[in-house]
């Protein structure tokens, strides 16, 4: 997908990986970048606007844990203004295995609900034009960091959901792919809690191993957007971008 002149909605576009990715997207010249985030950051929005004055950057407060109905209402406001949206990026995520319910609500249910809501506008069975979804998942969806099993499971669920969306594209007209960052230097990983305190030093131990910067991740994220491969499972690790092959162990045959 050529980013230039496109309309993009980015959920959690002001976070660690999210903000650097927003910067890279703005540099590529979309027509509109609509950022939905829980906490407003006027300085960050101003920076994005200054980076490329030709791009219209707007912000709406949004908590992904709200109902599908509330999300649909917000999206209607956006669609009424823009008329069309080309790409939805679902990027909300937390890493704190003390907060079991919220981890699942943000990392998985929020992605499902936001996706479900946008289908009201995109689903070709309802006369919609189709669209593209990029879901930020994680390499922990491939193989868990077992000290944070709740986080890892939530990302595995988001990845499975995305893979199903891609297979449903012939029915809905909506394509999808997953963005799976490796360990990236963000505030998310500098301090976080393991499940039941099974490893109090989990963050420290994790950062003893090679990582990547948010800029490296963001630059590869934009490459994945441009590649626009339905069903792709992108691994963004140590500054590299790789489409991985998913091993099939079972098939429903339906």
From Swiss-Prot:
<feature type="active site" description="Proton acceptor">
    <location>
        <position position="151"/>
    </location>
</feature>
<comment type="subunit">
    <text>Homodimer.</text>
</comment>
<dbReference type="GO" id="GO:0004022">
    <property type="term" value="F:alcohol dehydrogenase (NAD+) activity"/>
</dbReference>
<dbReference type="InterPro" id="IPR036291">
    <property type="entry name" value="NAD(P)-bd_dom_sf"/>
</dbReference>
<keyword id="KW-0560">Oxidoreductase</keyword>
<dbReference type="InterPro" id="IPR020904">
    <property type="entry name" value="Sc_DH/Rdtase_CS"/>
</dbReference>
<dbReference type="GO" id="GO:0006066">
    <property type="term" value="P:alcohol metabolic process"/>
</dbReference>
<dbReference type="Pfam" id="PF00106">
    <property type="entry name" value="adh_short"/>
</dbReference>
<feature type="binding site">
    <location>
        <begin position="10"/>
        <end position="33"/>
    </location>
    <ligand>
        <name>NAD(+)</name>
    </ligand>
</feature>
<protein>
    <recommendedName>
        <fullName>Alcohol dehydrogenase 2</fullName>
        <ecNumber>1.1.1.1</ecNumber>
    </recommendedName>
</protein>
<keyword id="KW-0520">NAD</keyword>
<dbReference type="InterPro" id="IPR002347">
    <property type="entry name" value="SDR_fam"/>
</dbReference>
<comment type="similarity">
    <text>Belongs to the short-chain dehydrogenases/reductases (SDR) family.</text>
</comment>
<dbReference type="InterPro" id="IPR002425">
    <property type="entry name" value="ADH_Drosophila-type"/>
</dbReference>
<feature type="binding site">
    <location>
        <position position="138"/>
    </location>
    <ligand>
        <name>substrate</name>
    </ligand>
</feature>
<dbReference type="GO" id="GO:0005737">
    <property type="term" value="C:cytoplasm"/>
</dbReference>
